[in-house]
């Protein structure tokens, strides 16, 4: 089947049951098919013929998505309520006990476990 991508870009590619589709209509940052929208962006294994970059810069500053909605998408976090200023590409909700978000609106700017976190306010200190 041929699916249409969000925004003004339409995809004529159909591979594995999904089209090369941005994460959302408002903010096309990631490129992944509709059948692989559960974790981090992995178009290399889901859509080999994807024509968009894996992590495009967003056209405008957008805060990190709430947990479990569009986790793993690259988002500039300049407007997130934290001290982070870099662009990260990590899941918004970690499934481990190392660093759990305080609330669903926490920014997804958490480094791997065991490293100093620049976003200590977004993680439970008792669990990190």
Curated annotation (Swiss-Prot):
It holds the Pfam family Keratin_B2_2. Keywords: Keratin, Repeat. It comes from the Eukaryota. One of its GO terms (cellular component) is keratin filament. Residues 5-112 are annotated as: 10 X 5 AA repeats of C-C-[CDPQRWG]-[APRS]-[CIPSTVD]. InterPro entries: KAP, KRTAP_type_2-like. In the hair cortex, hair keratin intermediate filaments are embedded in an interfilamentous matrix, consisting of hair keratin-associated proteins (KRTAP), which are essential for the formation of a rigid and resistant hair shaft through their extensive disulfide bond cross-linking with abundant cysteine residues of hair keratins. The matrix proteins include the high-sulfur and high-glycine-tyrosine keratins. Belongs to the KRTAP type 2 family. Interacts with hair keratins. This is Keratin-associated protein 2-1. The gene is KRTAP2-1.
């Amino acid at each position: 089947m041929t699916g249409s991508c969000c925004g003004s870009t339409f995809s004529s590619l159909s591979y594995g049951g999904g089209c090369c589709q941005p994460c959302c209509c408002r903010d096309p940052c990631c490129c992944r098919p509709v059948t692989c929208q559960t974790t981090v962006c992995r178009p290399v294994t889901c859509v080999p013929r994807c024509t968009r970059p894996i992590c495009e810069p967003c056209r405008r500053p957008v805060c990190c998505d709430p947990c479990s909605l569009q986790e793993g998408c690259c988002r500039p976090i300049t407007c997130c309520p934290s001290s982070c200023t870099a662009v990260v590409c990590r899941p918004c909700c970690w499934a481990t006990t190392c660093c759990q978000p305080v609330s669903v609106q926490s920014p997804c700017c958490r480094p791997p476990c065991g490293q100093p976190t620049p976003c200590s306010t977004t993680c439970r200190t008792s669990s990190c």
